[in-house]
Amino acid sequence: MKGIAILGIMLHNYCHWLKGIARENEYTWLQWKNDRLWEILQQPDEWLPMHLVSYFGHYGVPVFLFLSGFGLVMKYERSGQPEASFWRFTRYNYLKLFRIFIVGFVFFTMLDAFTPGIHRYLASEVLAMLGMYANFLEHPSEVVWPGPYWYFSVTMQLYILYRLLFHRWHHWGIVVVLMVGCWLWQMFYLDDSETLERLRYNLVGGMLPFGMGILAGRWSERLEVFCERDGQQWVTCFVLLLSMFLTFLFSFLSSQTWLWVPALIVVGTIALVKLIPSQVMPYVVWLGTISAAIFVTHPIVRKIFVRPYIHEDMYAGLLLYVVATLLLSWLMKKIIDQIPNPKL
C-alpha cells in the first residue's frame, strides 16, 4: 500500500503544476475543477494520464494516514510492548518523523534559495516547520513549503490524539464518534473555503482514514479470516471496481459526498494490493521501502524539472522527474539511515 500511495503522491505533486492539466479538490471543493476534468473525460487528449494523477493522486495521503493508525495499534496494542508515558511516546514519534523531515527540508531550502521562485520564510514559520505545528498557523498553504510537508504536522497531531484518547479507551465507538464528528465539522464549513482548508490541513481532515486504520488494526484477525476464504478474488475485483466507480461519483456529485472519498480510496487500495501480480509485487514493495525518502525528495527534484517542462515536452519532463526522484530517494534513504533511530 505504501508503494501505491507514494507513487500517486509523487506523480500528483508534479503533474498539478503543469499548464493545462486538471487540478484537484484536495483541501476545498470547487465545482470548476470537476467541470474541467469532466470536459477532458468527454474529449480525452494525450495528457489524460497526467490529468487523472493530478486530480486523484493526492489521495495517497489518506492511505498513509490509514497505515499510521493501523501501525500504532500493531505497535502499542498488539505487540505486548510496555506502555510508554505520554512524553516518551510523543518524543519518540516526533524524532521518528524529524529524522526523515530534516534531511529533505535542509536540501530543499538550500536548493530553493538559489533557484527561481524562492519562498521567504519568517523565523516563526521556520520554527513551526521544525516543530511540526505549521498547519495550525493562519493560511497554512502559504506557510508550509514545500507543500507536501504539511503531512508531518497532521501526522504528529494524530499520533498525539491516539495517545491521549484511543490508546487509553479502546472502545470502537470512540473512534467512530470522532470520525463522524470531524466529518460534521467539515460539513458545517463547506461554504467557507478558508476555514475548510485549515480544518483539512489538520487532524479534522485526516481523522476518517486514520480512524479506519485504528479499527482495521483492532479487527485485523477477523478481517484476515474473511480475506482468506475461497473465491475472494472475485469479491476483491468487485470491491476494487465499486470503489473506483464510487470515487468518481462521489468526487463529482457534491461537496458532501466528496468528504467520503478518502474512505473509498483506502478500501480500493487494499483491494488493488491483493490483485497485484506476483511478478509486479516486488517492485511495489521496493517503492514502499523507500517511500519516506521519496516523500521528502520529490519536492526537491520537482523544483528542478517542472519549470523547463511546464509548457512543452511534458512527458519528457515527467520521465526525467520520476527517474531522478527514484535514484535520489535511494541515496537519500542511505543518508536518513545514518541518523540514529530514537529509542522509546
What are the functions of these language-model segments?
Residues 82-87, 107-116, 132-143, 189-196, ...:
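Short juxtamembrane and helix-loop transition motifs at transmembrane-helix boundaries
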Residues 7-14, 110, 130-136, 178-191, ...:
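Aromatic-anchored segments of alpha-helical transmembrane domains
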Residues 48-61, 140-154, 189-212, 244-269, ...:
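Interfacial loop-to-helix transition and helix-capping segments at the boundaries
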Residues 210, 237-341:
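Alpha-helical transmembrane segments of multi-pass integral membrane proteins
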Residues 1-183, 310-344:
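Membrane-cytosol interface segments of multi-pass membrane proteins
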